[in-house]
Amino acid sequence: MNLLKIEQLDYSVVNTTDVSHIKEIYLKSKKYKGGTACEVGSLGGHGTFSLCLAGLNVTSYDNDGHKGFKDKRETLCKDFNVNWIVQEGLYALNDNVKYDVVFHDSYHFEEVIPELVAFWFYKVKDEGMLIVHDVETFSHERFMFLIGNPRFERTKDIHGRELGTYYKNK
């Protein structure tokens, strides 16, 4: 039922994460039902929606750089209690809250690596996971080295964009 809801979303906007990756985020996050998630970069709310369907309490950071999407994502997730924060994701690093799942789909390329490393060490709980969209845009080997080479999975969508999932073990 939830996978059908995800499939029925509008994926026509160019920068929207592909349906295969939104479903993957949902399926991987279900094991944390009742836990917490931090999303960095929401655009139309597809990732937020999948995390909510998985039963997580979601805090979403988005600076609304893509104007016109704030209302769309809030409408999509109106049946859930999402903590919407209109700020860049770096603001999440200002508190001591850790999350079961962190989904990062904000900005990309080499300059994102320090932010991802900070989220890994300071925001992902032990036994939690970091999910990153567009991992093909930066040096994966460098990122892996900096976070201690954890267990990970990478998948590619039909557009060639990659989703990386990194598992944090005690």
Describe each PLM feature range.
Residues 11, 22-170:
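S-adenosylmethionine/decaboxylated-SAM
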Residues 1-18:
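Class I SAM-dependent transferase core
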